[in-house]
Amino acid sequence: DAFLHGTNGIEWDAVEIVSQFMEFWVDYDRETLFSMARHYETNKTLPEESYQKLLRAQNFRKGTNILAQVFLATVDLRLHEGFKEERDPDAVAKDVGKEILIHPSLPESRMLCSFSHIFNGAYGAGYYSYLWSEVLSADAFGAFDSVGNLTGSNMGPVPTLTEDNSLPPVERLGRRWSQTLLGQGGGRDPDKVFQDFRGRKPSAKALLHYSGLDLKVA
């Protein structure tokens, strides 16, 4: 059905998962990045020094960035779930900032004036989907990492691959990705589709790992 193809009909929880999943390949799989990171005139590949700088910058202040996303998502939900006309929206944002941010907002802050997502018919009360989709996409990429040893990280087992045994494991998992997350569109509950692919419910473990935030405190 044309009404269920692409992102049509997909619940907001998973609308960004495919696009963010593609970003993980560029961010964390060397072969993928070097297949496209070439000079437009000389066709030379990205210098190794530049690649190493990209890796070092990848998770710079990542924890702060995730907190900022949690802050924006929470502000969005608070304003929509129980808004009272007499309550100052900026006061709501500042209260949330005190709960979540390491450095609370400045008294003169009017961040809502530039937070256009909350006034958008599509993303109003749905800004959280950016971060939640990142959890899902990181978990999905982690399956490929475990099967193909892309970064040397083991993100846990994947369900038994019943696809074509003549193909390498990564390609077989790719077939499953195509048949589930890509192929089923908005035709089924995305949570069930994700579980069909991953063999379990989503986990934030992969996102924390790739963000450099899974360090164990002694």
Spans of model-derived segments:
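Cation-handling catalytic/transport regions enriched in His/Asp/Glu
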Residues: 1-218
